[in-house]
């Protein structure tokens, strides 16, 4: 009811999908994921033909093809050899099942450098591109991808406190709220602001003069001493999220999402 294709990596999942598709009166397409080295999801290559053959016999599913995922858990870089392995496995599954398995999904944004180099095998006919489109990054090194923008998403927080305070805590210190041991450099008195945001991982201030110092569960502490644009209580501060920051903000019910349509 919600999707035409599902990426799967186990027979048990396929069986449950087949039962659900039967109850819904539809024939659902699945893409069998194969692990070619990144060690995230996927059946091991030497079991791919066997698993696809089993799934192909389920009554309410169509095995649309094979897929893989790279540069995710293990950071393994896509290569021509790994893509050729996937295409070869597709051909073997075709022979074993008699099904066309037309879709061969070679990976995600990490495959773009291989594609741009002209080394992508012709049998790869699908990529699942996300970060490179939305954030404009080459995910292998996070450098800007040619022809894209890196400011398409901004996380905006409001300043709820602005005080000049010491740069080193006063008193004995232990772990912070998240179990980390913090280290501080004495920079004298600094103008510090608190934003109504949570942990600072994976965000970068748009203003290069603003520095993220740390956070509690719902307070982001920033140094605005050298901010290019003066701030005050009630001011908005803008941040550029990376993939992790965008994921957290997108899934949080406490973050309002606004599409501005700006050029």
Question: What are the residue ranges of the model-derived segments?
Answer:
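Active-site-proximal beta-alpha core segment in soluble small-molecule metabolic enzymes
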Residues: 1-81, 88, 92, 96
């Amino acid at each position: 009811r919600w999707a035409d294709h599902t990426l799967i990596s186990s027979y048990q999942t396929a069986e449950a999908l087949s039962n659900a598709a039967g109850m819904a009166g539809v024939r659902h397409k699945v893409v069998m994921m194969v692990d070619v080295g990144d060690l995230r999801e996927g059946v091991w290559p030497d079991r791919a033909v066997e698993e696809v053959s089993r799934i192909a016999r389920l009554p309410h599913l169509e095995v649309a093809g094979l897929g893989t995922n790279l540069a995710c858990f293990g950071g393994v870089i896509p290569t021509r050899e790994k893509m050729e392995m996937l295409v070869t496995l597709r051909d073997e599954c075709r022979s074993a099942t008699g099904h066309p398995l037309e879709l061969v999904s070679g990976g995600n944004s990490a495959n773009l450098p291989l594609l741009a180099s002209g080394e992508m095998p012709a049998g790869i006919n699908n990529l699942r591109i996300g970060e490179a489109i939305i954030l404009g990054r080459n995910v292998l090194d996070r450098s800007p991808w040619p022809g894209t923008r890196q400011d398409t998403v901004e996380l905006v927080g409001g300043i709820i406190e602005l005080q000049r305070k010491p740069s080193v805590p006063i008193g004995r210190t232990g772990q912070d709220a998240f179990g980390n041991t913090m280290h501080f450099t004495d920079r004298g008195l600094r103008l510090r602001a608190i934003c109504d945001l949570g942990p600072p991982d994976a965000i970068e201030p748009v203003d290069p003069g603003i520095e993220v110092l740390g956070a509690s569960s719902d307070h982001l502490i920033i140094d605005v001493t050298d901010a290019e644009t003066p701030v005050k209580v009630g001011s908005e501060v803008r941040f550029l999220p990376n993939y992790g920051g965008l994921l957290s903000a997108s899934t949080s019910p406490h973050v309002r999402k606004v599409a501005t349509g700006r050029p």
